[in-house]
């Protein structure tokens, strides 16, 4: 059983892993650190579910709306701690006020990035700000489906390929209370490059990373430099963001992106 013909045809959304009825698929990093599905042939029953669900290869439900809005949150501090105008905060507040759940990308203790679930503003605030590294989806799609089946309002934020993967995974599930939000994505860099960059910073400044910000606004709203805190001492750098904007560290499928157009899969 082969899920994808080449690495340029797999975005790493993990829908195939989460749909497998036998749990035969695991997401494993390759030599560049990107996660790809690997099949345990001793468990696989060759049902083909993993191939059928792939939105990257089989197409996705497009949102043909061409209406555009400019949004600016009323609260300055909320805007300042967000990537831009803090539209995400306002939208997710609506869901949280309805006792719903919000899903997004958050730093973990080791500064890797994973999608997690939030039902309060404290956890939701971990989703604020840019994350220039691909997030590990884990079992997020399963959790979203469970929330919807429990009649909860749900907001999912992520890259366009992650949104498309989620919608394919949900299939005929009632999505009337699902709100999806994708970002204007520049591509997803390798988690291992980010990990090695942090090691480089720790060696250079002789300490441990305690905080990271990919778009530090204290030196200007339009800045494209990262801020790394070593033992709580702040350093303004541009090595990692330079590689990112030069398109040197993105996932192979990002150079073959099916969603880089105005017909986005999200709401």
What is the meaning of each model-derived region?
Residues 1-25, 205-228:
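A broadly conserved sequence feature marking short terminus-proximal activation segments
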Residues 1-7, 38-42, 237-245:
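Short, intrinsically disordered, charge-biased short linear motifs at domain edges
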Residues 2-3, 9, 15-32, 36-38, ...:
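Iron-sulfur cluster-binding cysteine motifs and their immediate structural context
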Residues 6-10, 40, 77-81:
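Short, N-terminal intrinsically disordered low-complexity segments that are rich in Pro/Gly
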Residues 30, 42, 105-107:
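Acidic/polar N-terminal loop/beta-strand segments that form early-domain functional surfaces
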Residues 45:
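Glycine-rich NAD(P)-binding loop of the Rossmann-fold in SDR/ketoreductase-type enzymes
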Residues 61-267:
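Iron-sulfur-associated redox domains of electron-transfer enzymes in respiratory
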